[in-house]
């Protein structure tokens, strides 16, 4: 029996995280170590996205959110950004049939209107073409940052207050969450970051408040189903307290 199958059998399906978020890091370094251009790393990472998406859906995860392109990534060399946009366009179009086969619904969050028009249209078409799927929602964070998300939510709330649609004393945690781009999704219980970096890099700043963080030295292009299962097993061995004592959690 392969390692991935052994690990999958150890997972407690009753204690799965509903929502897993992943910072897919290390594509450039992975390519550089092989004497290749950074774009080669991004191209090679597509297989990781495919495997992790399929594995998540197979075991019963309901939401998978991937940090695909941050607002800060626009500052990268033009050739890399152009290559990424081209790769995004071709990949999304190619993967629609696979997502439908696995009943995976595509979603996207971020400043999507800042994407090139062709990319935006292809993305919206893929979202529409998979909207009937119910097994899992795969969300791509594109031109996204946590600060952008909080800023747009605050701006919209301020507009609603100014128009008399919202009373200031009605603002609470739940209301703020409803204005974020992830409205309607549970907060991630588990955040995975590859490549050995141990920071959240402006990703889902509000939503990660109580998430368990899992860091692996493996670069994203090398991340496979077995690695996902190891992260989930690590999560299942943790005690989530939400501010309570260990005794209170055990008693519950």
What do these predicted ranges mean?
Residues 1-252:
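Flexible, compositionally biased loop and terminal segments
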